[in-house]
Amino acid sequence: MGKVVGIDLGTTNSCVAVMEGGKPTVIANAEGFRTTPSVVAYTKNQDQLVGQIAKRQAVMNPENTFYSAKRFVGRRVDEVNEESKEVSYGIEKAGSNVKLKCPVLDKQFSPEEVSAQVLRKLSEDAGKYLGENITQAVITVPAYFNDSQRQATKDAGKIAGLEVLRIINEPTAAALAYGLDKKSNERILVFDLGGGTFDVSVLEVGDGVFEVLSTSGDTHLGGDDFDRCIVDHLASIFKSNEGIDLRQDKQALQRLTEAAEKAKIELSNATQSEINLPFITATPEGPKHLDLNLTRANFEELASKLIDRCRVPVEQALKDAKLSTGEIDEIVMVGGSTRMPAVQELVKRVTGKDPNQTVNPDEVVAVGAAIQGGVLAGEVKDILLLDVTPLSLGVETLGGVMTKMITRNTTVPTKKSETYSTAVDGQTNVEIHVLQGEREMASDNKSLGTFRLDGIPSAPRGVPQIEVTFDIDANGILSVTAKDKGSGKEQSISITGASTLSDNEVDKMVKDAESNASVDKEKREKIDLKNQAETLVYQTEKQLGELGDKVDASAKAKVEEKSKALKEATSKEDYEAMKKLLEELQQELYAIGSSVYQQPGNQPPAPGTPDSNESNDKGGDDDVIDADFTETKD
């Protein structure tokens, strides 16, 4: 079995780690950073950019730069109305699924495809570091992700060419990293506020056992929302002063978003931040600039509702775990957004404890995923992980009611069966509507899909016995089976109403990603070849100039001819000719170099003969200087 990497696929930033010598190691990306922005872009030349370079060009290319894709993964269009208004790229509907519009390619991407490109970069960078091809990974998801979102994350891994061995909850991964060396039992609360999601998990940790007691959260709350507070504040001030809504201009919106994120980060350490955006827009009267100061107190006031929303999941998780704040030993803070002083104050206020600051909030989740990868690969022994399902699962029954079969915070993997019957006389088929959520009415919960069981023998209502089985695997992904006990007919779920991709769509995306990877590789090779050619032409001109008359005239003419031909091939982008001429010119230069050294006076000294600059005087005993040393003591 090859190396299994752990990947924290974040909303704003992602991170990859691996077990080395029994210890988890965070792997720096090709640019040298330990975290990678979860950003994918396509340039006007149709080149793909991923990570830091994609983020850097976002202002100039807002409609073809995709970020925060995690907020759309595994969700339907009607579930992302608010999020779709806050991004600079276009969101389109394909059936009930979300598609991201890429004008420069005249193409639509699923959010899973964008996430897959981030995963591919992380796995490729890890492969370069480890010196082997990475094909297996453990990927983290927010604890409060529903079944569709988990399956969609797994699909993203598959599109990236990875076998996803396990989907693990982010707070659980953080607890693994925190508690790896802990021998004594501790009850810990993991407070995970990332770029787009918020989770709270309560765990019992000690002596290799990690048991999740409860989990709660909000998949619509994260650092992006805090940025948006600042964006709205800046835009409303500018509108009241200038009468222009900057949010309607995609380029201006992107600049505002970047400035807001920068200000938010600065305000975690400073009491005020200066926001200066020259030439943010223009009117017939001339260019307009945005310049103002934002204080920490002002920011905390703007974000007060968001900060208050962090309280409820903490209280809910403690209630579900049947624990008081006094029974919690440590508060582990995870996610970059936990650096905000107001968030730390809230945690201290609610729990009565100072948060534990010993873990790196940006890297701890990837480290935990790497540990889980080590467990699955057999590198890490004596660790038992007992996770839970975050939301209740059930079916719709008579009257539009949701009947729960597996309640939230049930330890996974788990399996449960219930027997149901028909609602009318002579009914020969039933439709099973699978739901996830905590509300009483089916319509208020998340629909995971529907499927039919046909071939039920005609009988009075209430007589047929239909056994429905829910089976949740260790990834938290659900499969459902319905069986008629009378006829023995059985049907597994074939989701028709879910937002996840079909197997055919995933397979097509895998093939597209593979072909794009080979196209990208070819582009890179061509760019490298062009760079080599340009460098060699420059070095040739420089070398000929430095050597001057030392080079034979005919040899010089030959080299100049080859150099000129290579220059022309480079400007025409004739790669076959470039390859041939590059090799020929190098050979000519080697020949010139040899001929220069063979000229009289340029030969290197024979082995064993002294250099002309060296003295022949070997020195004798007279050259030895004696010295006496005396040790002085204070």
UniProtKB/Swiss-Prot annotation:
Residues 592-634 are annotated as: Disordered. Transmembrane segments: none annotated. GO terms for molecular function: ATP binding; ATP-dependent protein folding chaperone; unfolded protein binding. Residues 622-634 have a biased composition (Acidic residues). Induction: By stress conditions e.g. heat shock. Keywords: ATP-binding, Chaperone, Nucleotide-binding, Phosphoprotein, Stress response. The modification Phosphothreonine is found at residue 197. InterPro entries: ATPase_NBD (IPR043129), Chaperone_DnaK (IPR012725), Heat_shock_70_CS (IPR018181), HSP70_C_sf (IPR029048), HSP70_peptide-bd_sf (IPR029047), Hsp_70_fam (IPR013126). Belongs to the heat shock protein 70 family. Acts as a chaperone. This is Chaperone protein dnaK2.
